[in-house]
């Protein structure tokens, strides 16, 4: 069975891993980095992903960041003169990860396990799966990020029973999961979180502070200047990271804008104490889900054996201190917070292929599911933290006499009134026979698969007529849209491949011209003019093709030059070898001649 790669599709950074033997290994990107910025930019019709895209974010307005925060919504982003869905942008990141994983493995990759925040709802999970499909990946499993982290942490501890709390604060989302580990079973007891809390919010606090201070000093509002704001974003992210290791950092942004008197510069010192003060409310927000998860799991703090930190934002000292204060435990730092999720996803891939044995993953649904009933009430069918996959049925009836149809309004959330929860979808069961209210028996069945994706069925028990839908929110894509996007993605991949081949050819041509000119110069007056002339003629032909910018001609002329240059190099080598041989022969003769001069006459006296 072909390899299943594990992908952590993050808000700020993404990573890809693969199982090698029994070890999960992070695959470095072409720049040698183990994580890849989740950034996409467009330039001259070219799609740029990762480090290169992030580097040009300041100067290129067609740059998209933090697209994960829009997954599951109908919001689109404008770039490159077009509108893109979050699924399409995410697919570009996935395609890039897939591409360099294939380069590393030396084979095509078609299957992946992709992670999502535990608190992602159905629409967000479906959007992630669609993004994988657009990127040419069969998504074998959607796994919750804290669960994947627990897999990576606990794979070598299957003989030990323990309860762990995974605290996962990433670039844009926050999750807390509590798991019980033992005998190879990873049982998620509860999960809680906040999809609107992450490292980006900590960056924003610094940005807001810098904008306010600059306005106070110079009377200019930088928040209206897009390029200045991107520079501030980069500086804020760097300052946040610096303050994890030092207590003070200097923010220096020369020529940030211009005033009446000329250019203005931003120079500011940010202390860790000030940063902690600015972000105090964000740190406080992390405490509520911790308490919620413990309560839902029915556990006290003393029953938690280990606290695992996941996500780059858990390096913030104030966050670490808050975790210690809230749990009463020193966090376990045995895993790399940036890499552990992708590694866990690769392990789940190994479980699917059978390469990892005796491991069972029991995950849960993060939010309750149900339907709207009379009076706008939200009636739950499946409670949050129910182990998945699962199925649950309940019988309902009509609200009016002779009601010919029922509307099924499917919701996800925890609030008692339907209007306050997230609508997943609506459908109708029609042709109900005329009868007094309360008589028809309508059975509603919810199914949640192992990926946390919901399907709902309504059945009239009297007529046996039924209606089923796989939930598709208003942000969902139709099969036709996904097919079109897949074709676009394939075309882009083909265009990228051609562009790379073109760059490689131009580099080869430059290298061949340089090397041949050097060889022709070195062989001047060495007695093989015919070969030199042939190489020179081929060189001139290649230069002409290069000037004409004819790629096919360049390829043909490069092959011809390589052949002629090789003939010249052979002659040069033969001449050098003959000279070497002659020199060695002369040295041998000299040594033999000198041997006679070393004979000394001596007298022998007999005693």
Curated annotation (Swiss-Prot):
<dbReference type="GO" id="GO:0042026">
    <property type="term" value="P:protein refolding"/>
</dbReference>
<dbReference type="InterPro" id="IPR029048">
    <property type="entry name" value="HSP70_C_sf"/>
</dbReference>
<dbReference type="InterPro" id="IPR029047">
    <property type="entry name" value="HSP70_peptide-bd_sf"/>
</dbReference>
<comment type="similarity">
    <text>Belongs to the heat shock protein 70 family.</text>
</comment>
<dbReference type="GO" id="GO:0031072">
    <property type="term" value="F:heat shock protein binding"/>
</dbReference>
<dbReference type="GO" id="GO:0051082">
    <property type="term" value="F:unfolded protein binding"/>
</dbReference>
<keyword id="KW-0597">Phosphoprotein</keyword>
<dbReference type="GO" id="GO:0140662">
    <property type="term" value="F:ATP-dependent protein folding chaperone"/>
</dbReference>
<dbReference type="GO" id="GO:0005524">
    <property type="term" value="F:ATP binding"/>
</dbReference>
<keyword id="KW-0547">Nucleotide-binding</keyword>
<dbReference type="InterPro" id="IPR013126">
    <property type="entry name" value="Hsp_70_fam"/>
</dbReference>
<protein>
    <recommendedName>
        <fullName>Chaperone protein DnaK</fullName>
    </recommendedName>
</protein>
<keyword id="KW-0067">ATP-binding</keyword>
<dbReference type="InterPro" id="IPR012725">
    <property type="entry name" value="Chaperone_DnaK"/>
</dbReference>
<feature type="compositionally biased region" description="Acidic residues">
    <location>
        <begin position="598"/>
        <end position="607"/>
    </location>
</feature>
<feature type="region of interest" description="Disordered">
    <location>
        <begin position="580"/>
        <end position="607"/>
    </location>
</feature>
<dbReference type="GO" id="GO:0044183">
    <property type="term" value="F:protein folding chaperone"/>
</dbReference>
<feature type="modified residue" description="Phosphothreonine; by autocatalysis">
    <location>
        <position position="173"/>
    </location>
</feature>
<dbReference type="Pfam" id="PF00012">
    <property type="entry name" value="HSP70"/>
</dbReference>
<dbReference type="GO" id="GO:0051085">
    <property type="term" value="P:chaperone cofactor-dependent protein refolding"/>
</dbReference>
<keyword id="KW-0143">Chaperone</keyword>
<dbReference type="InterPro" id="IPR043129">
    <property type="entry name" value="ATPase_NBD"/>
</dbReference>
<keyword id="KW-0346">Stress response</keyword>
<dbReference type="InterPro" id="IPR018181">
    <property type="entry name" value="Heat_shock_70_CS"/>
</dbReference>
<comment type="function">
    <text>Acts as a chaperone.</text>
</comment>
<dbReference type="GO" id="GO:0016887">
    <property type="term" value="F:ATP hydrolysis activity"/>
</dbReference>
<feature type="compositionally biased region" description="Low complexity">
    <location>
        <begin position="580"/>
        <end position="591"/>
    </location>
</feature>
